[in-house]
């Protein structure tokens, strides 16, 4: 039996068993065989009185820092990472649609090994920022299914250090794409599910006509029901307020009884829709338990390109959805690809952006903000039952360089330690050396 005792740590707010940031007492965490055994105050003394030989246990002092569950990135494209400077891939207009065009024109030379090598670098960057759970889309509008094969291999190879969910995603459309042998995007999505993808993807706003987009939403729900898969659709990623595939997706998922297994990603058009429409739609979204994945940095960059001024922010209604009781999580989306020239997997930066863009900056909202990266993400991924700092669950957690959630958020603090099933994946030292008293404050 492997036992580790982590001492002197604050537990982040918004997590099971936690209280307000300012009053959370220091606690200790006992891990046995990769699972949380006990979490509580003055645990060292209690265990000693129960006859446990503390001196024989590996003990790690967390020095009053903040612990929370590992971060979740619920929207990423690992097969695209670090292709932004590839010949022919440069996106001159900075629009979503040119990004799709550039990718489609330059992806024919992909190999499984090359995709895996790039994706591993992207995963490593995310993990160094405290991410242990990633949902990545894999483009299947490729008769060779190269991206999907690569990411499925990585999912298995890295399962002990990071959890990957893979979306069978038709980047060029379910019914607008036709392969060299007459196969449709829908055919390839289904083939991806048979190969082991976790989620059904879609992109209705990119289809050639409204009818194709609507048909694709029916297909998504039918495939998810047929193969017992999750759903994650790139939905209404446009400034057009009349793009309303979210409404159809939500209604179909609700009627099929799989709303809680469904994620609508981006939904930028919801930020352009009027309040009367949102008021009507929010009732359906809440009843269906639809999840949302927002990629604030990328949507800010790609959207509003046809606007002069006023210029739209491009993101979905994060604040209003949250206030309506709808689950919203966050994603990096891209790392240096034809859609977005930067991105380094730092989810604290993604959180910072969404709080600013959604104007969620009250003290109460900031104190509650880590939920977007943690429990909300786990809800989107369908992993709540095995996620969180609770006895009996896998001992997965990170330690932040702060003592409260507020400090962590406003400092965009570093991750000092990442623990996976009781095993420390990495530690980081953020101390500085100085002779100036001022710089020690």
What residue ranges belong to the model's regions?
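N-terminal metal-binding scaffold of metallo-dependent hydrolase/deaminase domains
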Residues: 1-54, 405
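Active-site mouth loops of central-metabolism enzymes
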Residues: 102-118, 165-183, 204-211
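His/Asp/Glu-enriched, well-ordered alpha-helical/loop segment
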Residues: 230, 251-262, 298-302, 312-400
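C-terminal cap of metal-dependent C-N hydrolases
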Residues: 391-441
